[in-house]
Amino acid sequence: MRISLACLAALCALPAGVMAQDASVHDKPAVRGSIIANLLQDHDNPFLLYPYESNYLLYTWTSDLNKEAIRSYDWAENARKDEVKFQLSLAFPLWRGILGDNSLLGASYTQKSWWQLSNSKESAPFRETNYEPQLFLGFATDYQFAGWTLRDIEMGYNHDSNGRSDPTSRSWNRLYARLMAQNGNWLVEVKPWYVVGSTDDNPDITKYMGYYRLKVGYQLGEAILSAQGQYNWNTGYGGAELGVSYPITKHVRAYTQIYSGYGESLIDYNFNQTRVGVGLMLNDLF
């Protein structure tokens, strides 16, 4: 489906210079579910943008709100458990064919926000926003083993922060790899990482976030079922997200999401909660 600028504006307010009016978004992959194969498709429009992670908008409710982490905000005690959660995730190919026809140097930007929209008493503040740019080298492959086809190999640098100052600043930097394989209607992706640089704002983040993310997807008719999570086997801490989406128009899907555990956001990396959300999605795993 093609993501219109109007939809993106509804998800997140970005500087007009970044999202120029003649920019368009391409999200019809050459290989179903393959981010790299999608980015390798060549088009004449230099402002063409591609989806990276899923793009969605949800109304959510959480079992417990982490007021302790935001106690420095003057509205913390009045923070509400219901929030609008949305994710904007786009990618751009910087250099196709950098190491052969099926390779590219690319960049992506993912932003996830938790918005206290119903909290009119406190002027509807954003409780948390996570900014996640990446620079990566990607390869589209067709290696086969035991019925599975390895589609994506990606290696890169990831920065993830909430853009806050002390005492609510949270950030970490990682070197990562991403491998995605398919078998029929199944998709499996693993993304291990290695933390680099300072983690002074959150020195124990790997205790709760671990060293990898595992994602599994299955297409059942027109519905897409997804599960993803991170886990530290040494500490027993982690978090998981379950999702179901179904098309309601050509370009929009109904989406239900459940997150349970630690690390839904950076400010909540060491906080355990369960969040349920319903809303709309522009692109899923397939």
From Swiss-Prot:
CC annotations in GO: cell outer membrane
Record: residues binding Ca(2+) 1: 123
Binding, Ca(2+) 3: 201
Gene Ontology biological process terms from the UniProt entry: lipid catabolic process
Keyword Transmembrane (UniProt): yes
Cofactor note: Binds 1 Ca(2+) ion per monomer. In the dimeric form the Ca(2+) is bound by different amino acids with binding of each Ca(2+) shared with ligands coming from each monomer. The Ca(2+) ion may have a role in catalysis.
Physiological role: Hydrolysis of phosphatidylcholine with phospholipase A2 (EC 3.1.1.4) and phospholipase A1 (EC 3.1.1.32) activities.
Extracellular side stretches: 63-81, 116-125, 162-170, 196-213, 232-238, 263-271
Membrane topology: Multi-pass membrane protein
Family: Belongs to the phospholipase A1 family.
Cofactor(s) of this protein: Ca(2+)
Protein residues bound to Ca(2+) 2: 164, 169
UniProt-recorded name of the protein: Phospholipase A1
CDD domains per record: OMPLA
Periplasmic side: 21-49, 97-102, 146-147, 184-185, 221-222, 248-252, 284-286
One GO molecular-function entry: calcium ion binding
Catalytic site: 159, 161
Gene designation per UniProt: pldA
Enzyme class: hydrolase
UniProt entry keywords in alphabetical sequence: Calcium, Cell outer membrane, Hydrolase, Lipid degradation, Lipid metabolism, Membrane, Metal-binding, Signal, Transmembrane, Transmembrane beta strand
